[in-house]
């Protein structure tokens, strides 16, 4: 049996030092102090001391968890990973997660719902990408499947259209065919399905600009013609033609421009 001979407050608010039999024993939080009704003269068994220390570790974990989620919403896995960095025992981490969930500070379903809604309002990501991002945050596949299924197809279409319009603006100085190809690839990479991609492109309805494309072709052809000046005329023409074709320009238009360059 041991007796608490002194309790002193630390400089840190809400923290106290416990002295047993005249010797410093361990620190406790105010919560632990109140929960165990610790006071000078109280007699403690070895088992009680062990329980107090265990509770204090849990209280410390809870404090770390609360601080971590105070900056922004987190998933259970994110909090668990943060606590693990403090080398807290697995059972303590689970107690903290349970406590935070009971207090309403951890709710993976609500987190997923708000994350998806926020991205749909202003974002440009499709369901596949959002699912992948949320799975990385530790959310379960069945939970995500339910949340994503609840989103109307029109919402995904709006996001795809936003993404598509942004992509087209970025590549407006490219050949029309190249623009369309890059647009499709970009929407696929952002996680939209084929049906949504096709509908989004039809909604955006990008149109070619023959005059602008002709000017662009002439500039690009002249550039490539200079870059490949070391080849003989036949090989030079073929290499330039191949390059321009890969950039999405029309074959007949390429031939016309190359004929002009060859004659100049």
Swiss-Prot record:
Pfam families xref list: RecX_HTH1, RecX_HTH2, RecX_HTH3
Keyword entries, A-Z: Cytoplasm
Cellular component terms per the entry's GO annotation: cytoplasm
GO biological process: regulation of DNA repair
Regions crossing the membrane: none
Subcellular location: Cytoplasm
NCBIfam families linked: PRK14135.1
Similarity field: Belongs to the RecX family.
Function: Modulates RecA activity.
Protein name according to UniProt: Regulatory protein RecX
């Amino acid at each position: 049996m041991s007796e608490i001979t002194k309790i002193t407050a630390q400089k840190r608010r809400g923290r106290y030092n416990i002295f047993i039999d005249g010797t410093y024993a361990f620190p406790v939080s105010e919560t632990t102090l109140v929960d165990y009704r610790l006071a000078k003269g109280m007699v403690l068994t070895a088992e009680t001391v062990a329980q107090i220390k265990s509770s204090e570790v849990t209280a410390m974990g809870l404090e770390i968890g609360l601080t971590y989620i105070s900056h922004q919403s987190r998933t259970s896995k994110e909090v668990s990973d943060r606590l693990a960095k403090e080398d807290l025992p697995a059972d303590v981490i689970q107690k903290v997660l349970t406590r935070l969930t009971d207090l309403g500070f951890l709710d993976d379903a609500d987190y997923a719902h708000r994350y998806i809604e926020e991205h749909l309002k202003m974002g440009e990501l499709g369901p596949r990408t959002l699912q992948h991002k949320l799975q990385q945050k530790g959310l379960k596949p069945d939970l995500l499947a339910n949340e994503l299924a609840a989103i109307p197809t029109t919402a995904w279409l709006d996001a795809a259209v936003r993404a598509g319009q942004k992509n087209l603006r970025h590549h407006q100085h490219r050949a029309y065919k190249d623009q369309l190809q890059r647009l499709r690839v970009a929407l696929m990479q952002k996680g939209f399905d084929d049906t949504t991609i096709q509908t989004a492109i039809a909604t955006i309805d990008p149109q070619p600009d023959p005059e602008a494309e002709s000017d662009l072709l002439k500039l690009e052809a002249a550039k490539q013609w200079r870059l490949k000046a070391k080849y003989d005329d036949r090989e030079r023409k073929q290499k330039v033609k191949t390059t321009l074709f890969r950039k999405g320009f029309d074959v007949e238009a390429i031939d016309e421009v190359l004929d002009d360059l060859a004659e100049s």
